[in-house]
Amino acid sequence: MPADPASLIFAKITYMEDTRNVIDKFKGRSETEIVKELDAADHGLVIALENTERDFNMGTIVRSANAFGVRQIYVIGRRQWNKRGAMMTDKYLHVQYVGSTAEFVELMRAEGREIIAIDNIPGSFNMAETTLPKHAVLVFGQEGPGISEEMAQAADKIVAIEQFGSTRSINVGAAATVAMYCWLQQNVL
């Protein structure tokens, strides 16, 4: 079988010439090769982002997801999002766009995934006291409004990150990073 043309091009790039935002072991390798290796190491964490307005935090969440080995991200609602904060890390993930919350919920139910929404609304469970299921999808809302009412109703559980200061909430990009790491602590590390 002939080599992937992208592999041939990237094979010519030396370690020092590769300025992409990838860890050292991926320097000089094609996007296809990197995605294949990451897919082979998939630990099962899936996330979803409600995208009702253009939120700069989505790029931050996608970048953190990549760092934590997330392979699948669902973007619910608008297809357009600010990719600048992702620092091109979205190229190494599988991003699937879903038109509505109802469509997303149906898809997750068909996959047998538990929907765990992350938000600090009344009735949410404390993260430190919650077991995050292995076969779950962590859902994050928009900065400001948080998860939608429809998502709150559909979620199997809503989990809040405990806070100890005076602010009403932490930034959704920071909250997503904390929640993904908690899932990893419970299911992988």
What are these regions (language model features)?
Residues 2-189:
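Post-transcriptional modification and biogenesis factors for structured RNAs
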